[in-house]
Amino acid sequence: MAVPKRKMSRANTRARRSQWKATAPTLVKSVENGRVSYRLPHQAELKTDAAGTPLFLEYKGRKVADA
């Protein structure tokens, strides 16, 4: 296992750490029953009725599972 030869300064440590960035997920807009919702792409979407009761999961326009 690699071991640092010298202690890394606080400035260098913080400069290195500043490169760690979280990226915001890309969302897909979908409209269902007049409501706009955003979801992750390439994942099954939960379809609900007007009252909000979950009915089934849909992917690429096909029913893939019951809720």
Swiss-Prot record:
InterPro entries: Ribosomal_bL32, Ribosomal_zn-bd. One of its GO terms (molecular function) is structural constituent of ribosome. Keywords: Ribonucleoprotein, Ribosomal protein. The keyword Ribonucleoprotein applies. Residues 1-21 are annotated as: Disordered. One of its GO terms (cellular component) is large ribosomal subunit. Residues 1-19 have a biased composition (Basic residues). It comes from the Bacteria. It holds the Pfam family Ribosomal_L32p. One of its GO terms (biological process) is translation. Belongs to the bacterial ribosomal protein bL32 family. HAMAP family: Ribosomal_bL32. This is Large ribosomal subunit protein bL32. It comes from Micrococcus luteus (strain ATCC 4698 / DSM 20030 / JCM 1464 / CCM 169 / CCUG 5858 / IAM 1056 / NBRC 3333 / NCIMB 9278 / NCTC 2665 / VKM Ac-2230). The lineage of its organism: Bacteria, Bacillati, Actinomycetota, Actinomycetes, Micrococcales.
